């Protein structure tokens, strides 16, 4: 994914970007009835990657697969996080038009509203308990030269590092693969414990915009803390009993690099229920 991502250099010569064709080499050898390739939205939407998309379609067709390429919003399927991913799906013996219709019709059955961050975190054991231990102790410090946008949560850079504040009464922004240390999202525990109270982050942002304070004058309250591994996993819809291994930084990265589990399950069920039952029943293109 990294070679195609807008977060990277997006170089056509990136060796990692060639792995999408290696994927189809594996398909050619194993001849599965269906396949699913997942990648970043940019591969499906940016003009610079159109030659790659064309090669994927042509190669899959030569291998006898009808295909469709779709971009899905995780929030449309009950995931409490704004995350979009591309899925390239193929099936033997079915036309591409039929693959597309089977997939899109099947997806409709799984659409569900997404919960807010508050709803998700409130269902977990309390922060700092054995069931939700502290996993990031990076101090929350104010940026010396903040960047201000209209919202404290969207676009504004108020704190040191890449960790952004979490808006509790909305879905989470995309959890980054670089989580860990001061790149870990920030939660205001007092606002989580007291619904309806104004977030200090919002007050600070407003005071900066109106010239009533500065980073030198403001004092960060002790209730600002970092998102835990358990909380990040819940926002990615991992099962509660899922075990992550490695250092805390590696655990955060495993979560940030993942496809939300509920979205992955949805795609898998659609392939199982809508495509596998039709493989070979129709004439391929």
Q: What is each of the regions a protein language model found here?
A:
Residues 8, 39-41, 248:
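Short, histidine-centered active-site or binding-site loop motifs used for metal coordination
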Residues 8-14:
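Short glycine-enriched, charge-decorated loop/helix-capping segments at active-site entrances
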Residues 2-6, 244:
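Short acidic/His/Gly/Ser-rich catalytic and metal-binding motifs that mark active-site loops
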Residues 1-2, 40-42, 93-94, 180:
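Short glycine-rich anion-binding loops that position phosphate/pyrophosphate groups of nucleotides
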Residues 16-92:
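Conserved Class I SAM-dependent methyltransferase catalytic core
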Residues 1, 76, 254:
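Short glycine/serine/threonine-biased micro-segments
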Residues 5-8, 47, 100:
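Short, solvent-exposed loop/turn and secondary-structure capping segments
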């Amino acid at each position: 994914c990294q070679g195609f991502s807008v977060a990277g250099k997006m170089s056509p010569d990136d060796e990692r970007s060639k792995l999408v064709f290696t994927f189809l080499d594996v398909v050619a050898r194993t001849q599965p009835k269906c396949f699913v390739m997942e990648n970043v939205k940019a591969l499906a939407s940016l003009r610079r990657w159109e030659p790659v998309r064309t090669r994927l379609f042509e190669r899959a067709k030569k291998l006898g697969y009808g295909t469709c390429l779709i971009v899905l919003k995780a929030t449309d399927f009950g995931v409490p996080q704004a995350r979009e991913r591309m899925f390239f799906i193929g099936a033997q013996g079915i036309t591409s038009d039929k693959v597309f219709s089977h997939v899109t019709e099947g997806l409709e059955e799984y659409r569900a509203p997404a919960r807010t961050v508050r709803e998700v975190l409130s269902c977990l054991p309390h922060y700092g308990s054995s069931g939700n231990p502290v996993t990031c102790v990076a101090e929350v410090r104010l940026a010396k030269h903040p960047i201000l946008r209209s919202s404290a949560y969207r676009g504004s850079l108020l704190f040191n590092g890449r960790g952004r504040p979490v808006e509790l009464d909305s879905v989470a922004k995309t959890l980054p693969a670089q989580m860990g240390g001061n790149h870990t999202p920030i939660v205001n525990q007092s606002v989580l414990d007291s619904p309806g109270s104004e977030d200090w982050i919002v007050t600070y942002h407003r005071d900066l915009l109106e010239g009533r304070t500065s980073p030198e004058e403001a004092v960060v309250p002790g209730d600002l803390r970092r998102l835990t591994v358990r909380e990040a996993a819940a926002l990615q819809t991992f099962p509660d009993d899922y075990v992550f291994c490695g250092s805390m930084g590696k655990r955060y990265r495993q979560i940030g690099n993942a496809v939300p589990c509920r979205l992955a399950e949805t795609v898998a069920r659609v392939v199982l229920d809508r495509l596998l039952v039709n493989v070979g029943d129709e004439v391929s293109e």
